[in-house]
Regions:
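C-terminal accessory helical subdomains adjacent to catalytic cores in phosphodiester-
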Residues: 1-12, 26-177
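Non-catalytic terminal and connector segments of soluble metabolic enzymes
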Residues: 13-22
Length: 177
């Protein structure tokens, strides 16, 4: 069963998302790994906008898969728990939604779906879609679909396209699964 990792704790509330410090991630994952020593602990953090103090995050290997593999390995070494398998989404969850542009027909007009298809066809895989903070997959979707709701629409679209389509289009995600 999934456990949602918290990124901040107060006396009255736990927070998730919006990671500002790698050490918070490390602390939470180390605690989870030690609390569940006979279970695998994995993550689904967005690579886009990870904190600067994440091990090896500054690597600039031109091959995104080589780069992300090195960063994930460095994080796993730093956490130092045998049952931890750190995984980054390339570049963020919304990237995998570009696996099947036709699924956007559920929430968008044909002209928008065509623009999403054009974006997808401009990259080797959906995992390559990201040029800058302004052109991250979620930013592109929010620009094209003004009422785009990340959780609601992302869930609807990913369910429509199905896991097999995502696995076929996204090698890093497939390797993780």
């Amino acid at each position: 069963y999934p456990i949602v990792c918290t990124t901040k704790r107060t006396v009255s509330k736990k927070y998730k998302g919006g990671v500002s410090d790698y050490n918070k991630i490390k602390r939470e994952l180390t605690m989870l790994c030690k609390s569940h020593p006979n279970e695998h602990v994995t993550t689904m953090f967005d690579y886009y906008a990870m904190p600067e103090n994440t091990p090896e995050i500054g690597l600039h290997d031109p091959d995104i898969y080589e780069r992300i593999g090195k960063i994930e390995a460095a994080v796993n070494r730093d956490i130092g728990q045998a049952n931890c398998m750190f995984h980054f989404m390339l570049h963020e969850f919304e990237g995998i939604l570009f696996s099947n542009p036709e699924s956007f027909e559920l929430i968008a007009e044909t002209d928008v779906v065509n623009k999403i298809r054009e974006i997808r066809e401009s990259y080797p895989t959906p995992e390559h879609i990201n040029n800058s903070p302004e052109t991250a997959p979620s930013k592109r979707l929010e620009k094209l679909i003004p009422n785009y709701a990340k959780i609601k629409n992302g869930t609807l679209i990913s369910k429509d396209m199905g896991i097999d389509k995502i696995l076929a289009e996204c090698p890093h995600f497939r390797e993780w699964i």
